[in-house]
Amino acid sequence: MTIGILPEYALLEMFGFYVDEAQAVEEAQTEDDTQAVDNARDIEKWHTLVHVCRQWRYVVFASPRRLKLRLLCTDRRPVREMLCIWPATLPIVIWSNHRPISLMDGVDNIIAALEHPDRVCRIDLRSVPSSLLERLADLMQRPFPALEYLELRTENEAAPDVSDSFLGGPAPHLRSLLLKTVPFPALQKLLLSASHLVRLNLWNIPHTLYTTPEAMIACLSSLPKLETLRLGFRSPRPHLNLTNGPLPQPRTELPFLTSLRFLGDSEYLEDLVAWITAPLLNTVKITFFDQPVFEISHLPRFISRAEKLNALNQIDLMFDSRSVAATLSPQSGEANCPRLRLEISSTESDWQLSSLVQVCRQSLPTLSTLKRLDIREGQYPRPRWQDNNEEDAHWLVLLQLFTAVEDLHLSKRLALHVAPALQDLAEERAAVVLPALQNVFIERLPPTGIIRRAIKQFAAARQRLDRPITIKRRKRE
């Protein structure tokens, strides 16, 4: 049998599988800037099919919904000519190539596509100059009834406000919204009308658009289908006073939320998660701005209400010149496994250690279940370590949190600081710090030197307490 004698329904099923696979890749790449070009190409997979033969072309255009046909309009294409060639029923995707200069040169093509608001299903414009953002926003002061995906990004922190009449009011079919550095005062009004929203990403939020936790919770309560939430503030907000307003009763449940990303002050997050339940939460990444004192009580309760985040049994502590982070995950290491990451923006090593102790102690309900502890440096240059008794004390306070850890993995650089801190422990304290420890793995452990002497002295103290440990050399991962 040759493919030419297949019935049309069989061809349609084959084409549907082909396009569905492309769409799955597209959705997976939605949040990844580096994949933007491939993402756009995936939208046009159907072009290959219609150019094979007349029969295939007929099958494709006879089933535009089943095959999710869309017309890709960019700043570098003659959009007006394209609109005359292809069927007028095809939904329009507006996409920029993410280069501001090219986008300015090709703005007429973007405008030509925006002139068909009833057909536009997706708008993806990144690195938009502020002057162009204002112009495009003015062109979008009308309803876009088919719009499902909207992404606007500008790098200009002085970008003008987007008008309250943006999109002409409600956006009932909107499924994904990403705004980066885009000042949109009427955002709350838009969110309250977008009940089908699945992904919400508000990043680099300026102080002029500050939304109280109470108002944000009210918006989230109107988004029952939300799966991904990302909130990122531009900088710490001075003189925080977030708890005076009335909070909602009862707690808002987000039954489909699986991913949460937050960048901001701990006080804001506390007031937010105190009134949210997300039982299917699978991935959490939280970055706190540097602050002297962390007062966290609602976050661990929020985490404990997510079943998948209560089965994490290993923790990775990463230090670099910009931040310190603690990442919890299962030891299985499977793809798409549950993951909880807490990060603190801090540069000084002693401050990193003391902040990490505060956040881990207050935020992590599963400390007593962790079996593996990794301590390593990050991709940026290491922080400025002090190498003094005060820093040793900080290390010991941190390690004392992990009462169930059996395996300790140290990178070579961090072993230079952790091992000396363990070296001079009195025997009674050697039983308190990492009491369940059985194995120490040190990256490229030399046969002699500071690290070897320090860790051997700690091992001897544990041996006298009848709590022996094994020292092993670990290859660099």
Task: Enumerate the predicted regions with their spans.
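Leucine-rich repeat
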Residues: 1-477
